[in-house]
Amino acid sequence: MPTMNRSRRLALLCLGAPLLLAACASVAPSRGFDAGEGSASRHYTGRFSANYVRYGRDEGVQGSFRWEEQGRNVRLDLLSPLGQTLAVVTATPSGATLDLPNKPPRNAPEVDSLLEEALGFALPVAGMRDWLHGRPAPGRPAKSTRDTEGRLATLAQDGWSVRYVAWQEVPSASQAPAPRPRRIDLEREGGPTPLAVKLVIDPEEAP
C-alpha cells in the first residue's frame, strides 16, 4: 500500500509540474494603456473556472482573476489557486497582447484565439468589457432577457451564451446601491470544441 501511495503522489506531481513551473516563472510587465488622461477606471477581482476539451480530452482549470479597465482598455491577470500568475492579457482598441511566463509577448488584433492556443481555453475579453457591467456590448447584435427587477438575465452575443446567475448591490457614497453581477456563467456557442466558463466576482467596496 505505501508503494501505491508513493506512485500516486509521483503521478500527480508529474501531471501538475508544467502548470506549477509556468505559474512560478516570471511574467513581463504588461504594455501600458493607450487611453487618454481622465478615462474612468474600474477594478474587479474574483474567481474563475473553465471546462473545455483539448486534444479530445475533457479538461478543467480554476483560479482567480484581476480585471482592470480604463475606458475601452483592459488588463486581465489570470492566477493559479496558489496565487502565481498564469497569464496577463492587455487589450486596447489598437490590439491585444498576451504575456506568458518565460515566453516572449504575443500580439494579435484580438486575444481570444491566443488564449485558447496557449492555455486551452478562451475568455471573451472584448465582450466582458460590457458583460461585467451587466449590459450587452454596444454596436453588435444581441438577444437578451431580463428578470423581474429589470436586470439582465440571459444574453446571446458574439457567439457566447451568457447567464447572470446572481447579482449584488454595490454601495455608493452618494447614491443608492447599484446592482452589479455577482456570478456569470458563459458558454461558447458553435465553437470548434465545447467551452464553459464561470466567473464569481468579489463584492465591491464603497468608494
Swiss-Prot record:
Source domain of life: Bacteria
Cystines in this chain: none
Any one GO BP annotation for this protein: protein transport
Subcellular location: Cell outer membrane
Lipidation (S-diacylglycerol cysteine): 24
Record's keyword terms, sorted: Cell outer membrane, Chaperone, Lipoprotein, Membrane, Palmitate, Protein transport, Signal, Transport
Main localization, broad class: membrane
Topology in the lipid bilayer: Lipid-anchor
Region (Disordered): 171-207
Pfam families xref list: LolB
SUPFAM superfamilies assigned to the protein according to its UniProt record, in alphabetical order: Prokaryotic lipoproteins and lipoprotein localization factors (SSF89392)
The family this protein is said to belong to: Belongs to the LolB family.
Protein's recorded name: Outer-membrane lipoprotein LolB
Lineage of the species this protein comes from: Bacteria, Pseudomonadati, Pseudomonadota, Betaproteobacteria, Burkholderiales
Gene: lolB
